[in-house]
Amino acid sequence: MSSNCTSTTAVAVAPLSASKTKTKKKHFVCQKVKLFRASEPILSVLMWGVNHTINELSNVPVPVMLMPDDFKAYSKIKVDNHLFNKENLPSRFKFKEYCPMVFRNLRERFGIDDQDYQNSVTRSAPINSDSQGRCGTRFLTTYDRRFVIKTVSSEDVAEMHNILKKYHQFIVECHGNTLLPQFLGMYRLTVDGVETYMVVTRNVFSHRLTVHRKYDLKGSTVAREASDKEKAKDLPTFKDNDFLNEGQKLHVGEESKKNFLEKLKRDVEFLAQLKIMDYSLLVGIHDVDRAEQEEMEVEERAEDEECENDGVGGNLLCSYGTPPDSPGNLLSFPRFFGPGEFDPSVDVYAMKSHESSPKKEVYFMAIIDILTPYDTKKKAAHAAKTVKHGAGAEISTVNPEQYSKRFNEFMSNILT
């Protein structure tokens, strides 16, 4: 599915429902049409582009099987925009989707409907996260918190192309039951001559259950503490030494531990075969009792400060922006969940603490950052760190086989 076209106007916009959706006494303002309104042009272009490509894909029959060319294919569009939505979209931009048929197939295998995916990315602007990856990587979540949008480098895009066929085959063989990132789309956006690459994945954390503490674990102990700057954040990302120094454990019980480690071992062996390393286990902890207390405080505050009328029908803009009108969308919460409860088909990385756990918790655990190959740079970094810290030190830049073995051992020790 390769196309290269120039358009003077943007794609037709779809009407939205004008119904009001309430969440915790907040009101939404519905847009009659998709305006792709965002705080910066790059996000408006992302919303426009995903809306356009999903609409285009809906007209392409689903093939019986993917062909080798699908793993090299792309669709791209150049827009000279002088008429449509000038307040929100740049006058000129380009949008490229990589391997559209492959990512559509992956979304299907991960149980994600294209319409839901489109709605999540395009209904309201993505939200900036205070998380920041290496080399200034930027993270956003969709307004409903279902998906994570991450800026990546052109080298990451090249590595994704290198592994995509084997990754897809692995997902087919494990029926989507994996701790690996669920890659759902990869795009290049060009605004004012600047190219930005973005990858969309399923959110490891829940759209509904608050994460109270999080860790990025590699199984290495050299220089693996959160910085003072990181610790000052509302939700810092702690690291291996922080985890160990706190005496932290994840209380999942024997059976859940066995199942989790089997899945982890299979996933990590796959990464070692691809000569990939430097990945992490992202861990989020939801404290059920604390969440209940916070919920009560929110409700008490909401009663004290009922939403003020804005003079146009009593609607207020809420932090989620435009509401969904699809009954299956997560913000409508069609099912009731008690404290610490979740839908395992949605929160696929979630695991409850064992009943013998000292605290009632929900853990979210997944492998992240799998686009680092063991290349010449990594070999050089390993040599330098070995000289500095000694051959026996638990440095992070070891070879992929050593890395996977150490990673598995560390994760086995933190689960109980």
Curated annotation (Swiss-Prot):
Tissue: Highly expressed in brain, heart, pancreas, skeletal muscle and kidney. Detected at lower levels in placenta, lung and liver.
Amino-acid positions noted as binding GTP in the UniProt annotation, renumbered to this chain: 203-204, 214, 369
SUPFAM superfamilies, alphabetized: SAICAR synthase-like
Phosphothreonine modification, residue list: 8, 322
Residue positions where N-acetylserine is found in the record: 2
Modified residues (N6-acetyllysine): 94, 150
One Pfam family cited in the UniProt record for this chain: PIP5K
InterPro entries (alphabetical): PInositol-4-P-4/5-kinase_C_sf (IPR027483), PInositol-4-P-4/5-kinase_core (IPR002498), PInositol-4-P-5-kinase_N (IPR027484), PInositol-4/5-P-5/4-kinase (IPR023610)
GO biological process terms held by the UniProt record: 1-phosphatidyl-1D-myo-inositol 4,5-bisphosphate biosynthetic process; autophagosome-lysosome fusion; cell surface receptor signaling pathway; negative regulation of insulin receptor signaling pathway; phosphatidylinositol phosphate biosynthetic process; positive regulation of autophagosome assembly; regulation of autophagy
Residues annotated to bind ATP: 202-204, 214
Chain residue ranges for the region called Required for interaction with PIP5K1A: 64-70
Membrane topology, as annotated: Peripheral membrane protein
Recorded GO CC terms: autophagosome; cytosol; endoplasmic reticulum membrane; nucleoplasm; nucleus; plasma membrane
Start and end residues of each PIPK domain: 38-415
Keywords: Acetylation, ATP-binding, Cell membrane, Cytoplasm, Endoplasmic reticulum, GTP-binding, Kinase, Lipid metabolism, Membrane, Nucleotide-binding, Nucleus, Phosphoprotein, Transferase, Ubl conjugation
Phosphoserine carried by residues: 19, 326
Catalyses which reaction(s): a 1,2-diacyl-sn-glycero-3-phospho-(1D-myo-inositol-5-phosphate) + ATP = a 1,2-diacyl-sn-glycero-3-phospho-(1D-myo-inositol-4,5-bisphosphate) + ADP + H(+); 1,2-dihexadecanoyl-sn-glycero-3-phospho-(1D-myo-inositol-5-phosphate) + ATP = 1,2-dihexadecanoyl-sn-glycero-3-phospho-(1D-myo-inositol-4,5-bisphosphate) + ADP + H(+); 1,2-dihexadecanoyl-sn-glycero-3-phospho-(1D-myo-inositol-5-phosphate) + GTP = 1,2-dihexadecanoyl-sn-glycero-3-phospho-(1D-myo-inositol-4,5-bisphosphate) + GDP + H(+)
Post-translational changes noted in the entry: Ubiquitinated by the SPOP/CUL3 complex. Ubiquitination is stimulated by PtdIns5P levels. Phosphorylated on serine residues.
Keyword Cell membrane included in the entry's annotation: yes
Keyword Kinase: yes
CDD domains: PIPKc_PIP5K2B
Oligomer and partners: Homodimer. Binds TNFRSF1A. Interacts with PIP4K2A; the interaction suppresses ubiquitination by the SPOP/CUL3 complex.
Function: Participates in the biosynthesis of phosphatidylinositol 4,5-bisphosphate. Preferentially utilizes GTP, rather than ATP, for PI(5)P phosphorylation and its activity reflects changes in direct proportion to the physiological GTP concentration. Its GTP-sensing activity is critical for metabolic adaptation. PIP4Ks negatively regulate insulin signaling through a catalytic-independent mechanism. They interact with PIP5Ks and suppress PIP5K-mediated PtdIns(4,5)P2 synthesis and insulin-dependent conversion to PtdIns(3,4,5)P3.
Name listed for the protein in its UniProt record: Phosphatidylinositol 5-phosphate 4-kinase type-2 beta
Organism: Homo sapiens (Human)
Lineage: Eukaryota, Metazoa, Chordata, Craniata, Vertebrata
Gene from which the chain derives: PIP4K2B
